[in-house]
Amino acid sequence: GILMAKKVLMLAGDFTEDYETMVPFQAMEMLGYQVDVVCPDKKAGDIIRTAIHDFEGEQTYSEKRGHNFALTADFDAVNTADYAGLFITGGRSPEYLRLTPRVIEIVQEFFAANKPVAAICHGPQILTAANVLKGKKATAYPAVGPDITLAGGEYVAVDASEAVVDGNLVTAPAWPGDSAITREFIKLMGAKWEL
């Protein structure tokens, strides 16, 4: 029979962090996953604009205009039952995406079904708004740590290149952790590979 590629849902929006979107997207596509990248009020082929965040000596990250990223699916057509897992990008988009009730619903549906969920950098801002972190260990961009604590989660400070796994949730602080979070996420979805 035909091998059906596992589908992953990726939530992103304008000024999503460039590396935190494109790197996991391409890595999962390379492995054969179908990655449906969606944004509220947008359809497949519509563009979101990425932001490039970095540390250049100021007290917080700098931001530069990144690339145009073409969405691969329609937000309004999302049925969470079709997906093996959810990946939430970081950057500036999580702050406003969490104001869309359907975004919150989507997150809660993945947690209710105990499906793998990954969130990087500012991505956990969506998890805190969805009230799904009670009793869970999670990391994030350090400035999001207080939100995790207030949401009843346990904020874990780790190196930017690391990821934290608690059950079917995997989180990472920033784009140096792209490899770690993507690796743990696909493991949670049952992927096995050998070199």
Model region roles, listed by residue range:
Residues 3-113, 126-137, 145-195:
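Extended, subdomain-level signal for the structured scaffold at the beginning of enzyme domains
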Residues 120-123:
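Short, thiol/selenol-centered motifs that function as redox-active sites or metal-ligating centers
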